[in-house]
Amino acid sequence: MADVAWLKPDHHIVMMGDSDDVDVRDRISVAAYLFLNPVLRFGGFDRLDYESIWDLGMKAGEEYAGMERRKPDFTSLFLEHSGNTYFRSDWSERANFLHLHSGTMGAGHGHSDKLHIDLVVNGEDVLMDGGRYTYVSGSKRFSYKDPSGHNTITVDDLPFTVCKDSWECSKLSQPVKENFRCMELAEFAQAGQLGYMDLPGGVYVNRKVVYIKPDLYVLADEMYTGDRHTYQQYFHFNNHGTVTQNAPGEKKFPCVAYRGKMAEADFYFVSAQVKAELKRGHIARHYNVEEENTVCKVTKPGDGFTSLITVIDAHPGRPLSIEKLPVRSALKQTDYPETMAEALKITTGEKEYVVILCHQEVNSPTDLVEADGCMGYGNVIVFDKAEDVLVGDVLNW
């Protein structure tokens, strides 16, 4: 059933670890037939493929065609044991889909991909894992396995997992699997990793993902440390589309835009002191087949706690505005510093959302957090101002 949960809208799996870009409906179809499972049948082919009929027989093909198909009773899901979260707008082939990985590396075939995300918009890949390309030990193998080859965060341009050869590592990173919550307006997941605790001051890296359904995402990367470091975010784009960067001053925040055949997405880097640059990268959907793609690298220095907030608009044809807001103590009427709490107001046409993100324990039993007239009790809260300015969707306490 996990294969159904992590299917992308195009029926392929994400290229996680040493996986290629593979349609797995043949395996799901066989499982559906063997276990007589209508949900697996939903995730499989309409009719058994040739190889499956060869294995199971002609009668199996006829019986499979007559089986019940049942849509899963979930869209988004957290597979807590493996540490994988899947946000999905619906079960159509034109759905939006985001995957967050925060689990085990998976031995020699695993990559250094803690806190990596994949993003699909309108059924088309936007952010992708680069794949594997080769098993031959060396710089090329490591470039696909290292954190910089994934859509994740690094500290001081150092890897949190260090490859020893094609299969072994001289340093590993412990994942921290945290929580997941689905509500009517928004969904949430967060996870961390301990791969930088050996740096000066130690650095705990935490990634929060807020999904405002159906087409807005907020990434909040939090780095907890007592020292000064430089942080890097990586965004590896599908090479079947074009990636452009806005000119300085053209927009309020640095912005990178992806335009593909079916998908459009804008990435806004809303934290202060960020530098975004586009670079050439590589992607290998299949073994020994390498292509060029575009990578966005975002850099920010920080002394002590540092955050990097990114807003992803998966429907950029509409008007959009983003405003950074202070978070206040509703009782004391004082603003919290950004190292403790931050807020965003995101306006899309007639919709106006307020997102409160608390980085520290600012809540108390006698107080509420407040931003732009919206008040609630929690560490991550989303408000649709037309519906609610008190309580909100509390996604994390």
Please state what every model-predicted region is:
Residues 74-96, 159-213:
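Extended, loop-rich substrate-binding clefts of extracytoplasmic carbohydrate-active enzymes
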